[in-house]
């Protein structure tokens, strides 16, 4: 379940944040939270309307928003990969591996 995965990863990152003064991590958490909200609202809109095409035609900014989210996801994926390479801490490694897997799932989900 991606919702619980988001919650779990955000909680783990918050714990990591306490141990460091990294602004990058803070930015990552903020973007992940924003992505979660976007994904949730997109899912609700599709379910409510029952048809993705009517959502697309109703909202011209929809495509623009979508490409912006893909940019954010790509940034997050790169950031997470970078962190993963540079950490020796197993708690952080597990957290970033989970985050990477989740981001790839969400990217695939939004794409389809």
Curated annotation (Swiss-Prot):
Where would you find the membrane-spanning parts of this chain? none
- What is the superkingdom listed in this entry's lineage? Viruses
Which GO cellular component term is one of those annotated?
Answer: host cell nucleus
Location of this chain's protein in the cell: Virion; Host nucleus
Q: Which UniProt keywords apply?
A: Host nucleus, Host-virus interaction, Transport, Virion
Name the Pfam families for this protein: Flu_NS2
Q: Name one GO biological process term.
A: exit of virus from host cell nucleus through nuclear pore
Motif extent (Nuclear export signal): 9-18, 82-91
InterPro entries according to UniProt: Flu_NS2 (IPR000968)
Quaternary structure, per UniProt, is: Binds M1 protein. May interact with human nucleoporin RAB/HRB and exportin XPO1/CRM1.
Q: What does this protein do?
A: Mediates the nuclear export of encapsidated genomic RNAs (ribonucleoproteins, RNPs). Acts as an adapter between viral RNPs complexes and the nuclear export machinery of the cell. Possesses no intrinsic RNA-binding activity, but includes a C-terminal M1-binding domain. This domain is believed to allow recognition of RNPs to which the M1 protein is bound.
Q: Which family does it belong to?
A: Belongs to the influenza viruses NEP family.
> What name does UniProt use for this protein?
Nuclear export protein
Species name for this entry?
Influenza A virus (strain A/Equine/Tennessee/5/1986 H3N8)
Tell me the classification of the organism that encodes this protein.
Viruses, Riboviria, Orthornavirae, Negarnaviricota, Polyploviricotina
